[in-house]
C-alpha cells in the first residue's frame, strides 16, 4: 500500500465541496417552494403574475448578484470594519473560476431574501415596479446586510460594533440576514402599494381573501422545508476540517446539532401554530400549521449551532406560536395587506429567534451578546426599511407601484401578462383572446359569466348565462338561459332560441334570445 | 507534500456522513410525496384534512421520536435479546450531539411508517383520534418493530429468535419494518373506522369514489420514487469502510447493487401494474401504474443488497402485479375501504418481497433463512395489528374514531378545520365563513348550488341557481334564475327580480324573486 | 496517529461516487419535471395520458436500457472507431455490480432524451404506438447517438471523424446527445401524427390550444432546473482526481465553471425570453419565460466547462431569445403542432448552443472545432430524423399512430385509459362510469352539460342544464332548468318539476320537466 502522499486539505476540499454543491442545489429548490407557497395564497387570476415574479427574482437576480451584488457585500464589509476595502479585490471573484462555487453558495441565499418580498405585495403591484425592486434587493439592499454581517462588516466580530462590544453578531444561516430582510422589505412594499380592493371593509375590518389552492401553499411549505435542510445544515459548510497538526477532523457534532435543532424547531413551530390557530379560530388550520412550520424554521435558522436542543425546540415553538398573532397585528392594527404573512413568518420569527440566541446558548447566557443581538436585529431592520422605502418610492414614481383598479379586478395574469393560468377552470384563455372575446378551441367545457363573446370551434359545451353572443362552428352543445344570440355555422338548423335541432344535442333554451 | 497523518476513520466519516445527511433530506422529502399521493386520491372537500394529518405526522412525530421513540427501540432490542438493556444508555443520544445525525437518519424512517397510515383512513377519521395514533406509532408501535429488528432484538442475528435459528431477519431498508408496519396499521384503522358513506352499495358492491386529482397522486408517486433512492441506496450508509489493515475500502459494488435493483424493481413494478390493470379494466390505468411503481419499490426495499439483479426485477414485477388484485381483495372480500390502497401497496408487496429474499439471494437459497423471513413478516404484522387495534380503540373511546355523517358529507376541511382548499373551484371558502353563510370577498366567480346566503363585497360575479339570498355592496354582476332575494346596497337601483339596472352589469333574472 | 496507509484512489472513489449517486437521483427527478411541464400544457382531458407516457418512458426505458441500450452504445462506439468492439465485453456491465452505479448514471441521461418526445405528440398519439417508440429510443435510437459521441465512436476524438479532423465533438452534458435528439425525434413524431383537431384554422392559421395549468408547467420547469444542476454539474463527475504523482487534486475550478455557466445561462435565457415574448405579444408571458429558462439551460449544457462565463451568458440569452421565434417557425411555417415546443426548446437551443462552443471557448476560437461541432449537430440530427421516422412509421402500421377523432374530442384519458384526472372539476369520473352514464358516488358537486344520465347516491348537489335524467336516492339538492326527468327514491315527495319538497333542500325547477 503506497503511503498516501496527499494534502489533507485536498481530501477536505473534495468532501466539503460535494456537500456545498448539493446544499446549494437544495437551496435553489426553495425558489419553486416560495412560488407555490405564494401561488396557493392568491386568487387564480393572479397565479401567472406570481410565477413570473418568482422566476424573475431568480433569473434576473443571479445576473445582478454576479455582476454587482457579491462585490458590494465585500465592499460594505470593508467599509464598516477597520479592514478597509479594495474594489478590484472585491470583484475579483468574477474572473476566478476557483471562487465560483462559493459565489453560487452565496447567491442562493441572496435570491431567497429577494423572493420572500413578492409574497407580501401580490395581486396588485405593477410588474415593472417589482422587477426594479427585485434587481435592487439582489444588487444592493441584501448585499449591504451581507456586508454588515457575514462579510466581516459592522456587526461581525471584526466590524466596528463587533470590535467595540467584543462579540460578533450571531445569525448562523440568515434568520435575519436573509429572512427578516425579506420579510421587512415585504412589509414596506405592502404598506406602500396599499391593500387589495375588498381586503378591508368600509369600517376597516379585515375581510380575508382566500388563496385559490391551500394544497399548493402546503406543498410549497414542505418543498421549502426540504430545501431548508440545505439552508441550515449546509451553512455548516465544513464537514472535514484540517487541524493544526496537519490532520483532519470530522465536524459531526456541529453538523448533528444544526440538523437536530432544525428538525425540532420545524416540528415545534408547526405544532405550536396548530394549537394557537385552534385557539384563534376554533379549529386547527392547515395554512397556519404550514406557516408555523416555516416560522419555526426561521426562528432557529440563526441559532442552530449556538443553542441547546431544548432551546431550539423552545425557539421553534415560539416562532410558530407568534406567527398568527403577529399576522393579526399586521392586518388588524397596522392595516397592512401582507398577502402571505411574510412579515409575521420571516420578519418577526427571524428577529425573535435571533435576538434570544444568548438565552439558550450552549455556552450559557451573555448580556453583551444579547445587546449585540438586539442591536443587530435593529440595524438590519432599519436599513431594510429605509432602503426598501426609497426603492419602492422610486419604482412607483417611474412606473406606478400599483396596477389599475380595473386590472386588479380582472386579474394581473390578463392585465400584466395576457394569459390565464387555468383556462379550463376559470377566466379567459390564451394570448389570442383579447379581453371580452374568447376563441375557445380547446374542447373544454365553458361556464361563462362575464358577458364576453364566444367563438367556439372545438365542440366544447357551453353553459351561457351571461347574455354573450356565441358563434358556433363545431356542433358543440349550447345551453342558453340568458337571452344571448347564437350564430351557428356548423350545419345545425338554428331554431328559435338558440336550439340547434340537428347535429348538436342542444336542450331547449328558454331565454327568448334571437338566433340566426 | 506532507505525508498525510490522518486517521482513515475521519476521512471515511466525512464521506459517509455527507452521504447520510443528503439521503436523510431525500427521505424527509417523501413526506410531501405521501401527502400528494393521498391528497390526489381524496375528494376536494377533504384535501385540507389530508395535508393537516401529513404535517402532523412529521411535526409531532419527530418530537415524540426524539423524546421517546428512539429510546424505546433500543430498550426493546435489549429486552428481546440476550444483550439486555440500560434505560439511561438507551436515551443517551438525547444529550450527545455526536449521535444526532444518526438520530435524524433513524427518524426519517420512523416518520415514513407513520405517514402511510393516513392514506387508509382518509375522508372520515376524527382528527384528534388520528393525532393520538400518529403520536403512538412514532413513540411506540414502530419503535418496537425497530427494536425487534434493526436494534438487535428478537429477529436480528443477536436476538433470541435469530440466535436460535442461526440467521438474522433480512429487511435491508424497511420493506416490512417501515412499509408493512404502516400498511397493516392503515388496514386496521380503515377497518375500525368503517367505510366512507356511499363507498359500498346497498348489496355491498364496490362503488369507487374517485380522488379529485390523479395528477397530484402521480406527482406524489414520482416524488416518492426520488426520495426512495435515498431510502434504499442511503441505507448502504457506508461508502468508505475502514479495513482491518487500517486502509479504506470503497463499497461500490454494494452501492451499485442497491441502486440497480431499486431502479429495476421500480420499473418492473410499474410495467407489471400497467399490464395487470389493462387486463382488469380493459385499459392501462395511470393510477394503478403509479401504485405498481410504488409496490415494486416496496417489494425490493428489503431485498436490494441481498438479491441478484434479475431477482430484483422479478420481485419488483411481482409487487406491481399483485397490487391491484390485493386491493380488489381488500375491497371486495374484506369490505375494507382502504382509500389509497396502502395495505396492497405497502403491506402485501412488503411482505411478499421480503419473505422471498432467500429465493433470489445472491448467495443462493437457504431454507432456514426462508423460515426466519416468514416468521419475521408474521411477527411484525401480528404486533402491528394488535397494537394498532388497541390504540385506535382507545382513541375512539376518548374522541370517537369517526366524524359525524353530516360532517363527512360536507367535508372534513370545513368540519375539522373550517377551511376550503380550493375556494374558487368548489365549496365554501375561508375561516370567516360559517357553514351556509358565505362572505365571498375574493372577487372570484361563485357558482352557488347550496342554498347558502352570500354577502358579496368584492365585485365577483354570482351565478345563483339555489334560492340563496344575496347582499351585494360591490357592483358585481348577478345572474338569478332561482327566485332568490337580492339586497343591493351598492348604489344600484334594484329593479324587480334582482336586476341592478345601473352600475352592475346584470342580466335579466327570470326567477320571480323579490328584491329590495 | 497511524500514518494513513490508504490508496488515494479509494478516497477519490468515495468522494466521487457520493457525488455521482446524488446527481443521478437529481437527474431522475427531472422525470416528474418533464411530466408536469407537459401536463400543464395539455387540456385536462389528456393529463392522465401524459402521466402514463412519462411513467412508461422511465419504467420501460430503464429495463430496455439495462438489457439492450447500454450495450448497443458501446458496440456503436466500437463500430465507428478504429477501436472495434466485442459484444460480450459491451454487455459485461450486466453481470458486474461494480459497474452498476455508472450504468445508472448513464441511464438517467438516456431516459431524459426519451421523455422529451412525448411533449411534442401529446393529445392525439395512440398509447401503444408511443410505447413502441419509447422502447426503441431507449434501446436503439439514443444509444446510437451515445455510441457516436460519449462511447468513443465516430464523432469523439478517437472516432473515425474525430481522428480525421484531429478534434473530438464537444457536448459536455448532452445538449445535442440528449436534448436535441429528443427534440428532433419529437418534431418527427408531431409531423407524422398530424396536428390536433382545431389547432389550425380553415386557412391554416394558428389557433392556440392553451394547456389546462400554466402553474404545473412552471413548477415542472423549476423542478427541471433543480435536476439540471445534477445534469450539468454532475457531468463533472470527478471531484477528486488522482494525480500521476499519487496525490489527489480537487477539481474546484472545473466544477465552479460548470455551476456558474449553468446558473448564468439559465438566468439569461429566462430574461431574454421575457423580453422577446413582451415584444411578440405585448406583455411578458410566464410560459415563454419558463421555456426561455429551459432553452437557456439547453444552450449551455454542451458548453459549460468549455466556455467563458460571459460566453455562457450569451449562449443562454441566445437560447432564450430564439425559443419563441423557433416555435413560431415550427407552427406557422412548418405547420407542425409541437404541443410543448420541444423542438424549439431542446432541438434548436441545443444545436445552436453546441455549434457555437468554439466561438466562446476558454481556450480561444478553433475553426476545425467549429467544423466538427456543425458536423456533429448535423449527423446526430440526421440519424435521429431517419431512425425516428422509421420507428414511428412502423408503430403506425401496427397500431395506427393516431387515436380516433371521437376519442381525441372526448380526451385520451377516457379513450386510452378509462379515467378522468379531475373528476370533480371536469368531465366523466372513474372506471365504472361508461361514457354517457355516470354513477357519481363521490358527494362532489356535478355540473352536467353532456346530456348523460346521473345515478346519484352520495348527496352531491347537481346543477342540471342538459336534459339528462337523474335517479336520486340520497337527499341531495337538485336544481333543474332543463326539462330533465327526476326519479327520486330518497323519501322525498317529488312535486312537479323536480322539486323535492321535503328532505332535499331543492329549489323550484322552472323547466316543465316531468318528475316521478
Swiss-Prot record, chains A, B, C:
Lineage of origin: Archaea, Methanobacteriati, Methanobacteriota, Stenosarchaea group, Halobacteria
Quaternary organization: Homotrimer. Interacts with both GlnK1 and GlnK2 after ammonium shock. Interaction is rapid, reversible and dependent on nitrogen source.
Gene Ontology molecular function, alphabetical: ammonium channel activity
Cleaved signal peptide residues: none
Inducers of expression: Highly expressed during ammonium starvation under nitrate-rich conditions.
Basic and acidic residues: compositionally biased ranges: 445-491
Ranges annotated as spanning the membrane: 17-37, 59-79, 101-121, 130-150, 170-190, 214-234, 258-278, 286-306, 307-327, 342-362, 374-394
Protein name per its UniProtKB record: Ammonium transporter Amt1
Protein family: Belongs to the ammonia transporter channel (TC 1.A.11.2) family.
Entry keywords, A to Z: Ammonia transport, Cell membrane, Membrane, Transmembrane, Transmembrane helix, Transport
Role description: Involved in the uptake of ammonium/ammonia (NH(4)(+)/NH(3)). Transport is electrogenic.
GO terms classed as biological process: ammonium homeostasis
Membrane protein topology class: Multi-pass membrane protein
Location in or out of the cell: Cell membrane
Feature type site, description Twin-His motif. Important for optimum substrate conductance: 179, 346
GO cellular component, one term: plasma membrane
Region entry Disordered, spans: 426-516
Amino acid at each position: 500500500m503506497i503511503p498516501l502522499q496527499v494534502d489533507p486539505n485536498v481530501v477536505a476540499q473534495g468532501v466539503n465541496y460535494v456537500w456545498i454543491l448539493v446544499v446549494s442545489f437544495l437551496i435553489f429548490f426553495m425558489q419553486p417552494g416560495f412560488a407555490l407557497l405564494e401561488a396557493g395564497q392568491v386568487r387564480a387570476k393572479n397565479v401567472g403574475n406570481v410565477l413570473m415574479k418568482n422566476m424573475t427574482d431568480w433569473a434576473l437576480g443571479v445576473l445582478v448578484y454576479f455582476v454587482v451584488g457579491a462585490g458590494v457585500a465585500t465592499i460594505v464589509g470593508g467599509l464598516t470594519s477597520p479592514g478597509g476595502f479594495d474594489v478590484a479585490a472585491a470583484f475579483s471573484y468574477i474572473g476566478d473560476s476557483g471562487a465560483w462555487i462559493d459565489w453560487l453558495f452565496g447567491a442562493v441565499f441572496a435570491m431567497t431574501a429577494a423572493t420572500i418580498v413578492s409574497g407580501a405585495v401580490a395581486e396588485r403591484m405593477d410588474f415593472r415596479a417589482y422587477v426594479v425592486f427585485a434587481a435592487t434587493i439582489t444588487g444592493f439592499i441584501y448585499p449591504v446586510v451581507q456586508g454588515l454581517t457575514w462579510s466581516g462588516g459592522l456587526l461581525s466580530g471584526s466590524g466596528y460594533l463587533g470590535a467595540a462590544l467584543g462579540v460578533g453578531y450571531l445569525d448562523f444561516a440568515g434568520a435575519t440576514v436573509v429572512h427578516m430582510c425579506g420579510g421587512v422589505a415585504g412589509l414596506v412594499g405592502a404598506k406602500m402599494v396599499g391593500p387589495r380592493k375588498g381586503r378591508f371593509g368600509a369600517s376597516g375590518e379585515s375581510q380575508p381573501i382566500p388563496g385559490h389552492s391551500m394544497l399548493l401553499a402546503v406543498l410549497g411549505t414542505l418543498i421549502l422545508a426540504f430545501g431548508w435542510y440545505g439552508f441550515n445544515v449546509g451553512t455548516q459548510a465544513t464537514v472535514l476540517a484540517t487541524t493544526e497538526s496537519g490532520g483532519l477532523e470530522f465536524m459531526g457534532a456541529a453538523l448533528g446539532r444544526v440538523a437536530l435543532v432544525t428538525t425540532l424547531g420545524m416540528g415545534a413551530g408547526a405544532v405550536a401554530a396548530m394549537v394557537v390557530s385552534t385557539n384563534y379560530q376554533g379549529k386547527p388550520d392547515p395554512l397556519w400549521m404550514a406557516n408555523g412550520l416555516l416560522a419555526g424554521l426561521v426562528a432557529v435558522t440563526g441559532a442552530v449551532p449556538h443553542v441547546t436542543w431544548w432551546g431550539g425546540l423552545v425557539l421553534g415553538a415560539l416562532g410558530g406560536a407568534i406567527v398568527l398573532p403577529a399576522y393579526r397585528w399586521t392586518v388588524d392594527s397596522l392595516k397592512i395587506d401582507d398577502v402571505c404573512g411574510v412579515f409575521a413568518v420571516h420578519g418577526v420569527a427571524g428577529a425573535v429567534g435571533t435576538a434570544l440566541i444568548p438565552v439558550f446558548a450552549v455556552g450559557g447566557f451573555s448580556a453583551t451578546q444579547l445587546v449585540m443581538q438586539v442591536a443587530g436585529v435593529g440595524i438590519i431592520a432599519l436599513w431594510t426599511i429605509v432602503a426598501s422605502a426609497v426603492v419602492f418610492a422610486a419604482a412607483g414614481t417611474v412606473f406606478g407601484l400599483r396596477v389599475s383598479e380595473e386590472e386588479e379586478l380582472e386579474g394581473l395574469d390578463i392585465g400584466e401578462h395576457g394569459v390565464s393560468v387555468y383556462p379550463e377552470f376559470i377566466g379567459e384563455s390564451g394570448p389570442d383572446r383579447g379581453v371580452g372575446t374568447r376563441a375557445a378551441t380547446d374542447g373544454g367545457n365553458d361556464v361563462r359569466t362575464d358577458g364576453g363573446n364566444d367563438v367556439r370551434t372545438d365542440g366544447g359545451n357551453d353553459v351561457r348565462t351571461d347574455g354573450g353572443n356565441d358563434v358556433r362552428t363545431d356542433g358543440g352543445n349550447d345551453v342558453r338561459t340568458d337571452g344571448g344570440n347564437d350564430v351557428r355555422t356548423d350545419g345545425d338548423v338554428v331554431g328559435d332560441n338558440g336550439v340547434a335541432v340537428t347535429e348538436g344535442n342542444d336542450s331547449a333554451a328558454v331565454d327568448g334570445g334571437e338566433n340566426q
